[in-house]
A protein has these predicted regions:
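Short catalytic/metal-binding and nucleic-acid-binding patches
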Residues: 1-124
């Protein structure tokens, strides 16, 4: 999705916050670099937004890509399939694609034995 990420992650006990922190740090730098380096028509607008976000934050950052909060849910095995289906249907509900596997950034392709963009460990 263009303004949020839904993911199912598994980490060793008590390490999820560190994984999310490192993910946000790495991707923030990569996103800002891509905005600067690529021929992006909305470059100035996006950088202004990221600078404004950083100005409102208490941390000493030039740009702020991610919000400070997260919304983790601990999932039981019977709930995981429901959440995976919810995640896959998100771009369909938004009207971006007709089928979940048509959304390029979705793991839905992996669940239909088609190659996706990233390596995905299927949960069933």
């Amino acid at each position: 999705m263009s303004n949020h990420i839904l993911a199912i992650l598994s980490t060793p006990e008590n390490e999820l916050s560190g994984v999310v922190r490192d993910f946000k740090s790495f991707t923030s730098k990569a996103i800002v670099k891509a905005i600067h380096d690529e021929n992006e028509s909305r470059r100035e607008w996006m950088l202004q937004r990221l600078v404004a976000n950083a100005t409102r934050a208490a941390r000493n950052e030039s740009y702020k890509v991610w919000t400070h909060d997260n919304h983790p849910l601990q999932m039981q095995p019977h709930f995981i399939m429901q959440r995976v289906n919810y995640i896959h249907q998100n771009p369909v509900r938004a009207g971006w694609v007709d089928e979940p596997r048509d959304y390029l950034c979705s793991s839905a392709r992996d669940y239909q034995d088609e190659p996706g963009l990233l390596k995905v460990e299927r949960v069933w």
